[in-house]
Amino acid sequence: MRLRLIAVGSRMPKWVEEGWHEYAKRMPSELALELVEIPLNTRGKNADVARFIRQEGEAMLAKVQPGERIVTLEVQGKPWSTEQLAVELDRWRLDARTVNLMVGGPEGLAPEVCARSEQRWSLSPLTLPHPLVRILIGEQMYRAWTVLSGHPYHK
């Protein structure tokens, strides 16, 4: 099974790439953690933001193969504790489908992406910077795996 983070935005600072890779390399090979970056359309003061969101959504969905699970990260999603995330991760693992975790751009996800979502997850009611979200997701996936495997990382 693969866990794939599909996120709008590229060219992240080095600390973001290092943070993401640190947790991705800790994951076992049977739960590979992969990052797919969707380029962010340049926003100007007269930008057609609705069109950009739609284009970004189309690009995100183009990375998803038929039958794969889509989990959107949304403010209105369901908050999961670490233990609840571990339960979800175990369900996903038993389901054996690739899980695509979708993170939109500054204005959020396209409605078409949300409509395809099987689950909606909220990391926090706080507004989080997108670079930090990548690291948080990587760390939380690793932490959930350690809960399932009895590893002492999560105490």
UniProtKB/Swiss-Prot annotation:
Q: EC no.?
A: 2.1.1.177
Q: Does the keyword ATP-binding apply?
A: no
Name of the protein in its database record: Ribosomal RNA large subunit methyltransferase H
InterPro entries hit by this protein: Alpha/beta_knot_MTases, RlmH-like, tRNA_m1G_MTases_N
Major location (coarse): cytoplasm
Name the residues that bind S-adenosyl-L-methionine.
Answer: L73, G104, L123, S124, P125, L126, T127, L128
GO MF terms held by the record: rRNA (pseudouridine-N3-)-methyltransferase activity
Describe its function: Specifically methylates the pseudouridine at position 1915 (m3Psi1915) in 23S rRNA.
Q: What Pfam families does UniProt report for this protein, alphabetically? A: SPOUT_MTase
EC class, as a word, reads transferase
What compartments host this protein? Cytoplasm
As recorded in Swiss-Prot or TrEMBL, the protein's gene is named rlmH
